[in-house]
Amino acid sequence: VLYFDFFPRQGKGGGAWCGYFREQRYRDGEREAPVVGIVANFTRPTATAPALLSLDETETLFHEFGHALHFLFHDVKYRGLSEVEGDFVELPSQIMENWATEPQVLAEYAVHYRTKEVIPEQLVRKIRNSALFNQGFATTELVAAALSDMDIHSIRRYEPFNPEAFEDNALRLQRGLIPQIEPRYRYPYFSHIFDGDY
């Protein structure tokens, strides 16, 4: 069983994720299928138009659906052994995410919501060419976040300190992120590292 919770509402966490309501298990020798949910904060429909996903939202949906497929189709005998090696966790989701902009896949789902016209090949080329736009800055952000995570896990003396000042020093002064752009990957963003079931 797969449930979807696509739209933002008050009190709902930001971002998107996939998780279990019930893990796959065996009971009395019979396999019980998992109950899985994909949660997101996609653009809501309006009074005059359906929910039209941006390219980023579409890739996110494909990504989380990759996790959902992994959860739905694994088959383990002992609970708690359903996990895979840490470096494999994101593979199914990355594969699905990358398929989102493949021309053959786009032709199946990317249609105009009024005319039902399939996305033109010229627009597909533009989408694929734009995928690398601003990649240098995106990579810098990710590297800065990774190095900052290493910084906080490399503290040798445990004494009270100001985490915001520590983070600002790590992200702006040491990594050179420009002050005009707020860092996307602040420490609270990393909740999945210690909160996830990896």
What does each model-found stretch correspond to?
Residues 1-198:
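Cation-handling catalytic/transport regions enriched in His/Asp/Glu
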